[in-house]
Curated annotation (Swiss-Prot):
Active site: 9 (tele-phosphohistidine intermediate), 87 (proton donor/acceptor)
Pathway: Carbohydrate degradation; glycolysis; pyruvate from D-glyceraldehyde 3-phosphate: step 3/5
Domain of life (superkingdom): Bacteria
Gene: gpmA
Lineage: Bacteria, Bacillati, Bacillota, Bacilli, Lactobacillales
Protein name per its UniProtKB record: 2,3-bisphosphoglycerate-dependent phosphoglycerate mutase
Binding site for substrate: 8-15, 21-22, 60, 87-90, 98, 114-115, 183-184
Amino acid sequence: MVKLVFARHGESEWNKANLFTGWADVDLSEKGTQQAIDAGKLIKEAGIEFDQAYTSVLKRAIKTTNLALEASDQLWVPVEKSWRLNERHYGGLTGKNKAEAAEQFGDEQVHIWRRSYDVLPPNMDRDDEHSAHTDRRYASLDDSVIPDAENLKVTLERALPFWEDKIAPALKDGKNVFVGAHGNSIRALVKHIKGLSDDEIMDVEIPNFPPLVFEFDEKLNVVSEYYLGK
């Protein structure tokens, strides 16, 4: 059986400050750095050996991937970065404190923006300091595909081609795969892998630690699902 290990990035500085992060390129906190190292230690203890790793183009996921691979003595494993594994784009909520946003817009509205499958938050202004339209890491993309806001539905739509073109073929080739990504990009892929309904995915949370493991048969049917160390 092949294994797919999802590791959400360790706690970021904005997680710690309770801010909406999205595509803002925020670093790991001290706690988050240790979580990434501990994830690698759990991987080593479990004896999981990877053939390929994938991550986003955001430093908190990249660092988590590198730290986890290093701690599991697998830093040599090839790592491919893709914007398609980025966190959900929180639009105009990016950088806002979650509690303050609830006071400004109301608890119910913020809850809908955060937890509904297909309701978009307000768009981010194109001149916002965190706008991806002026970020050179996305310079090769057509401007029309760069989001100003995303819900989970849109996040899945842009992550799914990467699953179909990269991750699934690697698994079908018998490769064990590590994916260092983000809470919502992982949730989106979990929805697809498990065939969850729009309502069912709303109750799924992906913690910063520990990593989530899926084991598949040769047809990519899920054989088992578990968190390392639990």
